[in-house]
Amino acid sequence: MVSFCGVAACLLTVAGHLAQAQFPPKPEGVTVLESKFGSGARITYKEPGLCETTEGVKSYAGYVHLPPGTLRDFGVEQDYPINTFFWFFEARKDPENAPLGIWMNGGPGSSSMFGMMTENGPCFVNADSNSTRLNPHSWNNEDQPVQVGLSYDTLANFTRNLVTDEITKLEPGEPIPEQNATFLVGTYASRNMNTTAHGTRHAAMALWHFAQVWFQEFPGYHPRNNKISIATESYGGRYGPAFTAFFEEQNQKIKNGTWKGHEGTMHVLHLDTLMIVNGCIDRLVQWPAYPQMAYNNTYGIEAVNASIHAGMLDALYRDGGCRDKINHCRSLSSVSDPENLGINSTVNDVCKDAETFCSNDVRDPYTKLSGRNYYDIGQLDPSPFPAPFYMAWLNQPHVQAALGVPLNWTQSNDVVSTAFRAIGDYPRPGWLENLAFLLENGIKVSLVYGDRDYACNWFGGELSSLGINYTDTQEFHNAGYAGIQINSSYIGGQVRQYGNLSFARVYEAGHEVPSYQPETALQIFHRALFNKDIATGTKDTSSRMDRGKFYGTSGPADSFGFKNEPPPQHVHFCHILDTSTCTKEQIQSVENGTATIRSWIIVDSNSTSLFPEVVGSGEPTPTPMPGGATTLSAHGYLYDVTLWVVLLVSAIELVM
């Protein structure tokens, strides 16, 4: 006989346990290294022994601590500490000769733990939210802006309502309120908008200082191959170009003697490849792709009707509409804030207004009316993919202790996102120019887009690739589309490539390409890093061929002719730490105590069939709630793909 109990009643029986476990204790067994350059920076780290369990493969988790005043050399006042989390994984093969890769999710304000745990990291979390299994397609990653994920400025205790997303600070000495299934407490970064990155350019400065400390002073990294590659996703379409270009600008200043920083900031970072996965790169170029993806895509899904589609186009192109608003933003910013630092309130307001209008009138008719998923047009909402089991795992006491972290993990931080939005970071100019700058300086750019994503869709990615104005623009435009040969029987997508620039459309993949098509994503990543053509992995792309030309693909000029069938629907389940996976009725059942929950999963016929070992048998058991694993943010990773090392920088949880 199966017994049931309301969630609230179940949780009351473990209130004592919750009171002991809700706030992480002070980390123990942490190695502390003071900077040899006397800058006041520190590295603290542990060997966690989590996630990457391949014999002989080491991993390290910790923080780079930057003191107040670190960013003064860029003219930025910073009166708070920046504590950036990283998780470094050695390559599974030949780590001494492996290049290093940094992985970052976007947001802005989203944790890179999402990518690590559901896309390309060394492990996946099981449905019990307490154990992991190896990912055979790992890229072996980093976390960005301060206050994201496990990065922080200063710490404070908060309450959080998962349903309303209301977050309230607990003052010192204030009694700890009782928790239930949707009301949690935890320790997080300060949530002070003045102590995080205000825009992508600010974040680049903080990450560069992190890199100067880590690459020169972290004792676990001793490569013979000093190449560094950056892979990023979503808002990473801005992070990637801006961060990588900023790093290269600093490299050039160091080399030519125009950088006047202190001794510990003279390290040249040898940049090799920038990979952007379903990135929103340039708003002006990519906005036309939203009406097309909603109405005329390769899956034959008309997510909006002809009238709504026409309205989206009208909002984009009419006088005073989206396009005009972005052009106005850019003309003002180029004169009054050319570095995109958010220093001019008029520019900030105009650019923020442009983003708000374009989002509401050009993009959001799909999200409001279609009933389909924002990250996968092939799925109806709510969608449980990728599974959010990692959210609870990262706040398990044994995981927190192993990582040596003093706070609870959060998926995204609305304060960081608000700081970026407040200066109108989205529609500002410069992203495509950054990509052109990288290509002109010999740094490879690989654009990879799943063809079912709406959020940063492949039509917009293709337009961005064609909008890069550099020496070989015409040769890239002249290249045709070739199939991406993954093995003897499978074509994973289509690619246009000339030399160091490639644009790949990946079949049957949503926003998080490695989650949907892990082998295809890994092959593309591996080929890009090792100077092989994306189409076959057999041709060298680094050397000139006949008549001084680089390798280029040949085939049709357009990929739209390659059509797809809509996918079957995922079997739905609700994970209460990610309420976007739940229906309104399921959320109500949690609130009123009628839901039965095991391991943060609502028990119903679907979840019982999907996860019988977790929810399908035995008595319902109370689920101890972790300290608030939901929306705050994390930054960065370093991973390994057979031949690359990965650094996860939760630290671009850059607090600025």
Swiss-Prot record:
PROSITE patterns: CARBOXYPEPT_SER_SER. It catalyses: Preferential release of a C-terminal arginine or lysine residue. It comes from the Eukaryota. It is found in: Cell membrane. The keyword Secreted does not apply. The active site is at 234, 453, 511. The keyword Protease applies. Its EC number is 3.4.16.6. Residues 628-656 form a propeptide. Gene3D superfamilies: alpha/beta hydrolase. Substrate binds at residues 456, 512. A lipid is attached at residue 627 (GPI-anchor amidated glycine). Keywords: Carboxypeptidase, Cell membrane, Disulfide bond, Glycoprotein, GPI-anchor, Hydrolase, Lipoprotein, Membrane, Protease, Signal, Virulence. It is an enzyme of class 3 (hydrolase). GO terms for biological process: proteolysis. InterPro entries: AB_hydrolase_fold (IPR029058), Peptidase_S10 (IPR001563), Ser_caboxypep_ser_AS (IPR018202). Disulfide bonds join 51-123, 322-358, 329-351. Residues 1-21 form the signal peptide. Pfam families: Peptidase_S10. One of its GO terms (cellular component) is plasma membrane. Glycans are attached at residues 130, 157, 180, 194, 256, 296, 305, 344, 408, 469, 487, 500, 592, 606. GO terms for molecular function: serine-type carboxypeptidase activity. Its main location: membrane. Belongs to the peptidase S10 family. Extracellular serine carboxypeptidase that contributes to pathogenicity. This is Carboxypeptidase S1 homolog B. It comes from Arthroderma benhamiae (strain ATCC MYA-4681 / CBS 112371). The gene is SCPB.
